[in-house]
A protein has these predicted regions:
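OB-fold ssDNA-binding interfaces and closely related basic DNA-contact patches used
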Residues: 2-101, 143-144, 149-155
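A composition-driven signal for long, intrinsically disordered, charge-rich low-complexity tracts
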Residues: 34-35, 110, 132
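Short nucleic-acid-contacting surface segments enriched for D/E, G, S/T with interspersed K/R
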Residues: 65, 116-136
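Disulfide-stabilized netrin-like
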Residues: 97-125
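Short, exposed beta-strand-loop hairpins at the edges of beta-sheets
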Residues: 138-142
Length: 155
């Protein structure tokens, strides 16, 4: 079988980017096909640790903060594969991780949260947001589905 990937990238220290349909979620934020969107470029060891920990094991779930205020400065979005409990169908959904002013991370796999962040970007431009944007976590229900969204807190 012929290798369809770039041999130079595979045989070097560079990361080979393999295009997939999962990257459609990321294309709303950037034209890059890295498999994720992160609003900051980690430069220091501390920033790299923040990114790693946020992706590997976020501090809390958004569901645990319904009705509470978070001051969002950064966001990470990555596609994840979810199996539908009813149909068994595997589908790609956005995992959204919000980062607050103190570096705490809040995550959910949610198109509602993803769409809320897209709207924030349309209005407030791309993060990092300094100062942060105060938001209140909301949960809506449609049938048996929970939908997370954000309200901007007006001061």
């Amino acid at each position: 079988m012929e290798n369809k990937y770039n041999d130079d990238a595979i045989n070097s220290n560079e990361t080979a980017l393999i295009p997939t349909t999962d990257n459609a979620i990321i294309s709303d934020f950037t034209n890059a096909s890295s498999g994720m969107y992160c609003s900051f470029v980690p430069q220091t060891a501390d920033e790299k640790a923040l990114l790693y920990n946020a992706m590997n094991a976020p501090d809390v779930k958004i569901a645990d903060h319904i009705g509470q205020e978070i001051v969002v400065t950064d966001v990470i979005i990555e596609p994840v594969q979810i199996v539908d409990d009813k149909t068994g169908e595997v589908r790609t959904s956005p995992r959204v991780i919000l980062i607050d002013e103190e570096g705490h991370t809040y995550s959910a796999v949610s198109y509602g949260l993803y769409n809320a962040v897209k709207r924030m970007v349309q209005i407030f431009d791309y993060p990092s947001w300094k100062p942060g944007i105060p938001v209140r976590v909301k949960q809506l229900t449609r049938g048996s589905y929970r939908i997370f969204t954000l309200d901007i807190v007006r001061r």
